[in-house]
Amino acid sequence: MCNYSGSDVVFMAKRIGVFGGSFNPLHIGHLIVAEAAWQEFNLEQVVFVPTGDTPHKNMHHISKIDRFEMVKMAIKENPHFSISSIEIERKGLSYTVDTIKQLHAEWGSEYNIYFIAGTDAVADMPTWKYNEELLDSCHFICASRPSSEERIKQAVAYFGKKGCEKIHFLRTPELEILSLIHIS
């Protein structure tokens, strides 16, 4: 699809948000982030992807099937939210880069993927498997809090120009409050 603006031709791919996370448990902050990302980045939809067996977290006190069902129930009334079982069905460790590759293969080149993640995840990106390849294959929307800006700046700087172009920020003031009252 082309968007003609004067003599410039701009190819407009559809934007789809992929919200990966343990959702252990899912809380209102996750839903606020998904809704804000959908609105601010003009996403066609937001696909929630509960993590399977991850290399970075070993704290799934709620089973992956129960987390999947919890997210599914929470988003069922929102027409621009959906859920994918791609990671919970994967055997062995689940890496974000593999998920994004598989989604690109399923959806085709007409979609630009915007991976929605929290501050901690984006700050840890320099340690992720195939992080450069991952950043080549999708954009990141970082749901950040003002208190975490320095860690995020360091992660963006690690990736240089590509980090500046592909890591975007989503500020939702409610998250600062929610992080203070969240009970683990």
PLM region spans:
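Hydrophobic/aromatic beta-strand patches that form the interior of the parallel beta-sheet core
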Residues: 18, 47, 84, 114, ...
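Short, flexible loop segments at boundaries between secondary-structure elements
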Residues: 136-154, 163-176
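Short, solvent-exposed loop/turn segments at secondary-structure junctions
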Residues: 23-24, 53-55, 120-122, 146-148, ...
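Acidic, Ala/Val/Gly-enriched low-complexity intrinsically disordered segments
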Residues: 8-10
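N-terminal catalytic cores of NTP/NDP-binding nucleotidyl/phosphoryl-transfer enzymes
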Residues: 13-42, 46-52, 118
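Conserved small/polar residues in nucleotide/adenosyl-binding loops
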Residues: 181-183
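N-terminal Rossmann-like or analogous alpha/beta NTP/dinucleotide-binding catalytic cores
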Residues: 52-139
